[in-house]
Amino acid sequence: MTRGRVIQVMGPVVDVKFENGHLPAIYNALKIQHKARNENEVDIDLTLEVALHLGDDTVRTIAMASTDGLIRGMEVIDTGAPISVPVGEVTLGRVFNVLGEPIDLEGDIPADARRDPIHRPAPKFEELATEVEILETGIKVVDLLAPYIKGGKIGLFGGAGVGKTVLIQELIHNIAQEHGGISVFAGVGERTREGNDLYHEMKDSGVISKTAMVFGQMNEPPGARMRVALTGLTMAEYFRDEQGQDVLLFIDNIFRFTQAGSEVSALLGRMPSAVGYQPTLATEMGQLQERITSTAKGSTTSIQAIYVPADDYTDPAPATTFSHLDATTNLERNVAEMGIYPAVDPLASTSRALAPEIVGEEHYQVARKVQQTLQRYKELQDIIAILGMDELSDEDKLVVHRARRIQFFLSQNFHVAEQFTGQPGSYVPVKETVRGFKEILEGKYDHLPEDRFRLVGRIEEVVEKAKAMGVEV
């Protein structure tokens, strides 16, 4: 076990000098453990990660927790290995920090639990699955217009309070119930309150037993926020590679991962790049994103909440993320204001999987016709607002008539919201979704009142609601 000494502390960055020419490898974890000798000192149990070799037997490291109380001359021990975290069944239903230590007050992880290093190479080219397979979510608007790919990366855009968390919970619920799949949630640099709320909501909705949670929140040093996404990814990779599972990995928020890297970049002595970001931005993002993929054994599908600074989509942080995405789900406040939940914008959400060779010709044609109808309705709204419906041609009246039914039919009740709404949630298979929208486009339900289409699952539920109202079907 090699020992060194702290020679410089610059906020979250610590320089350590080793004796006898021994230098720990890049990414090795170093430990500083110090017992307070008087009331002016504090107990220190700190993990550092080696980032640079400076020469002269000195390394520059990033601290995974606060460096308060650290002084020059303190002893540092090289663990001889990278940070490693527990993986497997022991992680389910638990909450961890970046080092894989439980923070939910539910007891320690067994000492014999398997631990894997957080830095690992991406799967080799020959290990990747070549088939593109759709991940059925049971959420109509997603499955029809912006389908998710197994092993794909999905960007989730949305402001505060439009339903990102509820959508995430429903996806976790549906993957657990319908696919028996595991979910891993990585809270990266977001509010502690939101993490706490999410944990308790998951407990209440019963999906926590199929979920592992990892947090490195806003109040933590940049080292923790930089590495916590890798901790979550390592836990997800075990379920994919060792158990052949289809795993959902949620990262909230991927922008904070980049932000944390930029905070320490200048302190590490790197020359800033565009807008002050780290010069290694694309490399760091690539190392994370390339590990999220489908292999012959299983898949890791990632849903990443993306904050766009000052709504500037050309900012290097979101722009670098976009190049990795397979699909986007855009949540919009104006959709939520119409009482349509999930508040997904059907025209702004996209997916590279919406192609006839992947989803099939019928699904593709129905989805495109739905988008055309909604786009035409959007164009007509100004005319309707000024002149009213009577001034429209018969053809345009029919477009508006069907578009409103489509809009409402894109909504549905969620299982995880059942305790608030009192309405049972619905999981709609893709085939049923496509059939329902096809029949609406064909005019089969033009005679039914449009409010009957709101917050239902399959198209049969619309017919039943209309019958209950006394409408002749």
UniProtKB/Swiss-Prot annotation:
SUPFAM superfamilies: C-terminal domain of alpha and beta subunits of F1 ATP synthase, N-terminal domain of alpha and beta subunits of F1 ATP synthase, P-loop containing nucleoside triphosphate hydrolases. It is found in: Cell membrane. It is an enzyme of class 7 (translocase). Keywords: ATP synthesis, ATP-binding, Cell membrane, CF(1), Hydrogen ion transport, Ion transport, Membrane, Nucleotide-binding, Translocase, Transport. ATP binds at residues 158-165. It comes from the Bacteria. PROSITE patterns: ATPASE_ALPHA_BETA. It is a peripheral membrane protein. One of its GO terms (cellular component) is proton-transporting ATP synthase complex. Its EC number is 7.1.2.2. One of its GO terms (molecular function) is ATP hydrolysis activity. SMART domains: AAA. It catalyses: ATP + H2O + 4 H(+)(in) = ADP + phosphate + 5 H(+)(out). Belongs to the ATPase alpha/beta chains family. F-type ATPases have 2 components, CF(1) - the catalytic core - and CF(0) - the membrane proton channel. CF(1) has five subunits: alpha(3), beta(3), gamma(1), delta(1), epsilon(1). CF(0) has three main subunits: a(1), b(2) and c(9-12). The alpha and beta chains form an alternating ring which encloses part of the gamma chain. CF(1) is attached to CF(0) by a central stalk formed by the gamma and epsilon chains, while a peripheral stalk is formed by the delta and b chains. Produces ATP from ADP in the presence of a proton gradient across the membrane. The catalytic sites are hosted primarily by the beta subunits. NCBIfam families: atpD. PANTHER family: ATP SYNTHASE, ATP SYNTHASE SUBUNIT BETA, MITOCHONDRIAL. This is ATP synthase subunit beta. It comes from Bacillus caldotenax. The lineage of its organism: Bacteria, Bacillati, Bacillota, Bacilli, Bacillales.
